[in-house]
Curated annotation (Swiss-Prot):
Keywords, comma-separated and alphabetical: Cell membrane, Cell projection, Cytoplasm, Cytoskeleton, Membrane
UniProt GO molecular function: actin binding
Chief subcellular location: membrane
Protein name: Moesin
Function: Probably involved in connections of major cytoskeletal structures to the plasma membrane.
Membrane topology, from the record: Peripheral membrane protein
Gene3D superfamilies: 1.20.5.450, 1.20.80.10, 6.10.360.10, Phosphatidylinositol 3-kinase Catalytic Subunit, Chain A, domain 1, Pleckstrin-homology domain (PH domain)/Phosphotyrosine-binding domain (PTB)
């Protein structure tokens, strides 16, 4: 048995290794990859490699892998990448895995500056990327976001006088706007905005016109566009697939025959034969998908869409159920917290009641002691009065007294009378004070009974709250194609639809749009003028001032007849 050849294929989020046979074709390897990752929308993708001359090349599916112009790596290195882009991501990308691979590749292109993105849009896209990666904004997701060192294009960071913390804060603020979005919906929102970027989905090739002017040819899902050498954002001339009859090349010369019979051929020159081969291969693939979109879906696509719709609906229901459960959990936890607070308040009230009761008991004992003392004083007073009366009686019985004795007796009687009056007054005061103390004692006893009753009621309420608390705790959920080298020509099938009639840039809701414009002003004020203005930033701002967006520009460059556009191209 022939010895196997080691192959490593890197997708956007995984690394796969295979051992293939020397006679394994590109298609067999491709099929093995898509089967391994569970991908069914295979028509958008291809296997990419660096050839022996250091150029990025697509693996030919109809040829043996080892017979192609590969570098002598061990294992052989390939990247599984998007080769053809859809016209509308929300309508054409069906499977979640397809959407995720597109999202990751588009994000990589923006962060690496392969695709130009304005600073304010970069921040918005970074917030959707954070939602797709971490989920809804929270303290923990914010902390994880600040650990992510690759959230914005390096160009954007270097052009502004802002710290990393300031950038993270702005992305985090936007992230908070997406709380209700699922990770899948965040990916969709990211791609809807990204597909409006001028360089999205365009493959650029260096070409020359007959005058020898260096230009860019852009091949995308809608047709061919020509750009000046220093501006990949704003195409100057466009040829939709619906206006092209035939595409072919001979050596370095590339010829496009328009449908308009009186129009001359659109001719340009590439620097290498292999570049013309790649241009033709991309034209063939893009045109095939262009025509497929304008036909009824195949049974396979219909099945995929139905399955994706069911899965999306099931996930939506699951998210809604989860949201309900989370709301219930939150309400239960809040109820639990309120009960705990009420229990704490009751415990404090009970403690105060106990202290009040203790104080009243002490006051009651003091009053009882005082009352007892007053009773003793009253008894002593009664005893003194009786003794005085006895002495007075004895005095009246004296028959014979001297004048001096009579005077002494009279003084003594007066003193006794005064003492009696004083004791009588003291007795009345004591009786009055005793009555007051008795009333206080009665009130104290009533207060004591009230406190005891309140304590018993609080204890009963406490028991009821503890039972409710246990019930609340039980309610809380537990945490949880390939060009044939001999075929240098493409006959283009026709379709009369104008692809850009209703196409408009995707705009977020007004709130986000206003916030985006505010952020644009903030970032403009923070520009580091010492770095100079980026060429593409300048072009982008000029386009905005002129009221041009991607689709308005494409409509403009397709206006007029084909002959006029070809003449314009020749005269650049």
């Amino acid at each position: 048995m022939p010895r196997g050849v080691a192959v490593r294929v890197t997708t956007m989020d995984a690394e796969l290794e295979f051992a293939i046979q020397p006679n394994t074709t590109g298609k067999q390897l491709f099929d093995q990859v898509v089967k391994t990752i569970g991908l069914r929308e295979i028509w958008f993708f291809g296997l990419q490699y660096i050839d022996s001359k250091g150029l990025v090349t697509w693996l030919k599916l109809n040829k043996k892998v080892v017979a192609q112009d590969l570098r002598k790596d061990n294992p052989l290195q390939f990247k599984f990448r998007v080769k053809f882009y859809p016209e509308e991501v929300t309508e054409e990308l069906i499977q979640e895995i397809t959407q995720r691979l597109f999202f990751l590749q588009i994000k990589e292109g923006i962060l690496s500056d392969e695709v130009y993105c304005p600073p304010e849009t970069s921040v918005l896209l970074a917030s959707y990327a954070a939602q797709a990666k971490y989920g809804p904004h929270s303290a923990s997701t914010k902390a994880r976001l600040t650990e992510d060192t690759n959230i914005l294009p390096k160009r954007v960071i270097e052009q502004h006088k802002m710290t990393k913390e300031q950038w993270y804060e702005r992305v985090s603020n936007w992230h908070q706007e997406h709380l209700s979005l699922s990770k899948e919906d965040a990916i969709t929102e990211y791609m809807k905005i990204a597909q409006d970027l001028e360089m999205y989905g365009v493959n650029y090739f260096e070409i020359r016109n007959k005058k020898g002017t260096d230009l860019w040819l852009g091949v995308d899902a809608l047709g061919l566009n020509v750009y000046e050498k220093d501006d990949k954002l704003t195409p100057k001339i466009g040829f939709p697939w619906s206006e092209i009859r035939n595409i072919s090349f001979n050596d370095k010369k590339f010829v496009i025959k328009p449908i308009e019979k009186k129009a001359p051929d659109f001719v340009f020159y590439a620097s290498r034969l292999r570049i013309n081969k790649r241009i033709l291969a991309l034209c063939m693939g893009n045109h095939e998908l262009y025509m497929r979109r304008r036909k009824p879906d195949t049974i396979e696509v219909q099945q995929m869409k139905a399955q994706a719709k069911e899965e999306k609906q099931a996930k939506k229901l699951e998210r809604e159920q989860l949201a309900i459960e989370m709301k219930k959990r939150q309400e239960t936890e809040e109820k639990y917290k309120r009960l705990q607070q009420q229990i704490r308040e009751k415990e404090l009230a009970e403690e105060k009641n106990r202290e009040d009761l203790k104080r009243w008991e002490e006051e009651s004992r003091a009053m009882q002691e005082k009352l007892k003392q007053q009773q003793m004083e009253s008894e002593e007073y009664q005893s003194k009065v009786a003794a005085m009366e006895m002495q007075m009686n004895e005095a009246t019985l004296e028959r014979e007294m001297t004048a001096q004795e009579k005077e002494e007796m009279r003084a003594r009687v007066e003193a006794l009378a005064e003492e009696k009056a004083r004791l009588e007054q003291s007795r009345e005061e004591s009786l009055k004070e005793s009555a007051e103390f008795a009333e206080k004692l009665r009130l104290s006893q009533e207060r004591e009974r009230e406190l005891q009753e309140a304590q018993e009621a609080a204890a009963a309420q406490h028991a009821a709250q503890l039972a409710a608390q246990r019930e609340a705790q039980q309610l809380i959920p537990k945490d949880e194609g390939e060009e044939d080298e001999q075929d240098h020509e493409l006959e283009v099938q026709q379709d009369d639809n104008d692809d850009l009639d209703d196409k408009e840039s995707y705009l977020p809701d007004k709130h986000l749009l206003d916030k985006l414009q505010k952020l644009q002003s903030e970032l403009q004020a923070m520009k580091d003028e010492s770095k100079g203005e980026d060429r593409y930033d300048k072009i982008h701002q000029e386009n905005i001032r002129a009221g041009r967006d991607k689709y308005q520009t494409l409509r403009n460059i397709r206006s007029g007849n084909t002959r006029q556009r070809i003449d314009t191209f020749e005269n650049i």
